[in-house]
Regions:
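Hydrophobic residues in well-ordered beta-strands that form the structural core
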Residues: 122, 143, 201-203, 277, ...
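Conserved core segment of the aminotransferase class I/II
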Residues: 225-295
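Short, conserved charged micro-motifs
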Residues: 334-339, 376-380
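Conserved core of the PLP fold type I
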Residues: 59, 64-198, 208-226, 297, ...
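N-terminal small-domain helix-loop-helix segment of the aminotransferase-like
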Residues: 11-101, 108, 282-283, 349, ...
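Conserved glycine-rich beta-strand-loop-beta hairpin in the small C-terminal domain of fold type I
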Residues: 278, 295-305, 316-329, 339
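PLP-dependent enzyme catalytic core of the Aspartate aminotransferase-like
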Residues: 345-346, 359-394
Length: 394
């Protein structure tokens, strides 16, 4: 094929492949210690339990569970999901829609609401996958200022007045990539601003259950009085990313539009996978499984934080209460991209923070993942990074 004769859609003009996916090609090398991804630990994936539940589901439903299903979702799962979401969010949930991973929920929201040139306010830095999704819909991305606790409501209101956005995208709990958690008073204020200015809030909360210290906080959705907050949830981090089951919860009119959009995207989320997650919920298996995951991840996070405490002066880092990530800031004269090249030579990988930032910048920041490494790998890999940073400072 003559590549010069291929005319791709303009929506791809400003969208490149995920930098993380490119790094994944590198971390596949034998012996590589990777702090780069966001994968669950293999120990956390309940393969035997999923197998047992799938066998039970097939025995109970026969071939029907392998047939096409309703876009709105597998009926038993809709029932258990509605109760699960209401209990988790501590508020009335008027409508839910199962989706094929919570990233699809963001895609459907953009498909339903965003025209080319519409403005979406975003935390900066933010989750790269959904930033790419917004760019594919040719949205104008405007960053909102943050501090050590996350998004600043005063700057949010100023940006709303200035840019008249259609949507705000936020990850309020153990944010990806920073690990920060938004305080309850800011969550309340965001909901108030959404209702006052009629801005849809996409509250993306896939790490909510991965809490190792501290107490749970109310969702932004729980403060929503007029239906402007859409909650995006996921079972990828607490059961399995391979099942590709997530959900969105919120205003019925938005759910209906997203359902229409889903019909032309994948028809429906796999019935068998919905049924397996349904059984996780109905049989009360989630609390014990989540507790087991949190025990493992909490230990690994503490170990990585302990290693960071021995890093050279000039290195600062977040101290999350949960989630999968720690965000570190190196001295300003150190390029994380250059550091990555040297680290890969020593069989250690991470993601430079600039890849998560709207408009670039933050060249001296890195995101570190601890969930998918062994304790020995954390000690060895962090020791290598410490030595590389010390060498760069000298």
């Amino acid at each position: 094929m003559d590549q010069s004769a291929v005319h791709f859609a303009h929506r791809f003009d400003n969208v490149s492949g995920s930098a993380i996916r490119e790094i994944f090609k590198i971390i596949a090398q034998p012996g590589m210690i990777s702090f780069a991804g966001g994968n669950p630990s293999l120990n956390a994936l309940p393969d035997r339990l999923v197998s047992e539940l799938a066998v039970d589901v097939l025995a109970q439903n026969g071939k029907a569970i392998l047939q096409y299903g309703a876009t709105e979702g597998y009926a038993p799962f809709l029932e258990s999901l509605h109760a699960y979401a209401a209990n988790m969010l501590k508020c009335e949930i008027p409508a839910v829609l199962p989706v094929t991973g919570s990233t699809q929920a963001m895609d459907l929201l953009c498909k339903a609401m965003i025209d080319p040139g519409d403005t979406i306010l975003v935390e900066n830095p933010s989750f790269l996958g959904n930033l790419q999704c917004m760019k594919l819909y040719q949205a104008n991305l405007v960053p909102v200022e943050s501090d050590g606790d996350g998004l600043l409501p005063d700057d949010l209101e100023a940006k709303i007045r200035q840019h008249h956005p259609k949507m705000l995208y936020t990850i309020p709990t153990f944010q990806n990539p920073t690990g920060k958690t938004l305080p309850a008073d800011r969550r309340r204020r965001i909901a108030e601003l959404a209702n006052e200015y009629h801005v849809v809030v996409a509250e993306d909360d896939p790490y909510r259950d991965l809490r190792y210290t501290g107490s749970p906080l109310p969702s932004i959705k729980s403060f929503d009085t007029d239906g402007w907050v859409m909650f995006l949830g996921s079972f990828s981090k607490i059961i399995s990313p391979g099942l590709r089951v997530g959900f969105m919860a919120g205003d019925p009119s938005i759910i209906r539009k997203c359902t229409v959009g889903k019909q032309s995207t994948d028809v429906h989320t796999a019935n068998l996978n919905q049924a397996v997650v349904d059984q996780f919920i109905r049989r009360g298996l989630l609390p014990g499984h989540i507790a087991s995951i949190c025990a493992e991840y909490g230990k690994k996070m503490k170990l990585m934080l302990d290693q960071l405490s021995a890093f050279p002066g000039g290195v600062s880092y977040t101290k999350p209460e949960g989630g999968l990530f720690i965000w570190a800031e190196l001295p300003e004269n150190i390029s994380a991209l250059d550091m990555l090249t040297k680290a890969i030579d020593k069989k250690v990988a991470f993601v430079p923070g600039t890849h998560f930032c709207v408009g670039g910048g933050h060249e001296n920041t890195i995101r570190l993942n601890f969930s998918n490494s062994t304790e020995d790998q954390i000690i060895t890999g962090m020791g290598i990074l410490k030595d590389l940073i010390a060498e760069a400072i000298r």
